[in-house]
Each structure stands twice: as C-alpha cells, then as structure tokens.
C-alpha cells in the first residue's frame, strides 16, 4: 500500500527528534524526546523512540492508526554495530515501511542532498560518515571507551584528568582545575565514586566551563581545546579523502 505520510527520526545520544510530513514534504508535526542510542541502552532507546512516534502523530492531529499509512526512516545512534542491527531486525513498529540506519548516515544525506560529501558529528560522542556517490563509509562511533575522538565526553574526561593532576600538584593549578575539583568537594575519592556511574553525557557536562575558561585565558583550558581541534582535524582529513567532497561539521561542539 502506498504510504500517505513520511516520518523521519534523528535519534542521537542526547536527544531524538521526529518530523512527520505528507508525501509532498509539507510538515505536519515535529517533536523531540530523550536519548536514543541503541548501543548504550537498547531498550530505553526504543522506548523513547516509540513514545516520540506516538507524540508526533498525536501532535499532527492524527489517530495513532495513521502510523499504518506511514513510511518511517529512523537514524539511530549505535545502529552501525552489527550485534545491534541483529536486534533491530525484530523491531516492528506498526508502520507501512521501515528503514533503520545510523544517525550519521541520515545526517550526511541531509547535509549534502545526496551528493558526495561527508559529515563529522561532534556532540556528546562523535562519528563520521562519507558518501562517495555509491556507498557510505563510517568512521568512529565505537563508544566512549574506544572512540569518540573530538567529542564533548572525551574533552570532559581530559579536563577532569587534568584537574586531578593539578589537585595532586603534578602540574600547575588553574582557575579551571580548581573549579572542576570544587564540583567534587576537592576529593579525588568523590570523583572516583562518580566515575562508576557517569555516562558520556555526564562527562560532557563540563564542556561549557572549559570554553568559558579558555575565553578567560586559562592555559589548561586552551590546551584542551587545541587537543580536541587536532582530533577533529585528523578525522576530517580522512573523511575528505573518502568522499572527495565537502565535509560538514555537526553537533553541539560544531556550533559557533
């Protein structure tokens, strides 16, 4: 059956967005929800996506049964992992058609209108995608422990490590390192206990403080941003070579 509606979902590690249109592309409704990383927390991510689907259909003034007349494309963080793809094969929302790809693939397609090019998403985590006109090549996206070069989570981790070094007088202190340690009552043990449950988003929460400190002339903060810029440059050079087209930077850290 020919679908009557088109639904796109951009599911990132911090939040997800949905947009419902008719077949002519006229927007009927748009909604946002919580994180939708199917690698980090598969069940919670799909619960969030399911709630978002219901919300955007309702906001369009349609009955939920309209989903059976809707073609759905979901770009979800973590959907590039093979084991996750196997689980997603059993996800069957009540829609007319379904395609699930990674969030970075839909970002690349949207940024360049289907033409050759690449994107590097630098938010809480990071991942790149290059489209050469025939196929996508993905770079990174292997999680906070192994990957996420240039990301907010990695920047936050470096900053807190630096703060701990300064606290123990291994390197000089600065306004930034003192400010960061103050959040843990200047206690390395408190910091250690926090790391047990800290998510990538938790690590990334100190990023605004780093930028503010760098603007104020804090040398440690400026060094941290230089390291992050070098990481981003490394990824961008490879993406440029893969796509032979322009590279778009996206995500929270790419915002001026």
Label each residue range with its predicted role:
Residues 76-173:
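Phosphate-binding/catalytic loop of phosphoryl-transfer enzymes
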Residues 1-67, 110-116, 160-256:
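ATP-binding/phosphotransfer module of carbohydrate and carboxylate kinases, centering on a glycine-rich
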Residues 73-80, 122-124, 244-254:
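Glycine-rich beta-strand-to-loop/alpha-helix junction loops that act as flexible
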């Amino acid at each position: 059956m020919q679908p009557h509606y088109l639904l796109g979902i951009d599911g990132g590690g911090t939040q997800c967005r949905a947009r419902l249109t008719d077949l002519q592309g006229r927007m009927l409704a748009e909604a946002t929800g919580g994180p939708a990383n199917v690698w980090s927390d598969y069940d919670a991510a799909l619960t969030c996506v399911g709630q978002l689907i219901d919300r955007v259909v309702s906001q369009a003034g349609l009955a939920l049964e309209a989903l059976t007349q809707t073609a759905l494309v979901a770009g979800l963080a973590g959907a590039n992992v093979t084991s996750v793809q196997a689980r997603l094969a059993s996800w069957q929302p009540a829609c007319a058609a379904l395609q699930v790809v990674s969030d970075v693939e839909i970002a690349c397609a949207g940024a360049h209108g289907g033409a050759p090019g690449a994107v590097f998403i630098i938010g809480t985590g990071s991942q790149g995608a290059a489209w050469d006109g025939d196929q996508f090549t993905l770079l990174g996206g292997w999680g906070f422990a192994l990957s996420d070069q240039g990301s907010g989570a990695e920047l936050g981790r470096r900053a807190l490590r630096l703060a701990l070094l300064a606290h123990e007088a291994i390197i000089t202190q600065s306004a930034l390192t003192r400010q960061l340690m103050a959040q843990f009552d200047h206690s390395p043990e408190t910091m250690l206990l926090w790391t047990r449950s800290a998510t990538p988003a938790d690590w990334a929460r100190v990023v605004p403080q780093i930028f503010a400190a760098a603007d104020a002339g804090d040398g440690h903060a400026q060094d941290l941003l230089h390291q992050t810029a070098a990481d981003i440059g490394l990824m961008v050079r490879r993406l440029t070579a893969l796509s032979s087209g322009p590279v778009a930077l996206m995500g929270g850290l790419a915002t001026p």
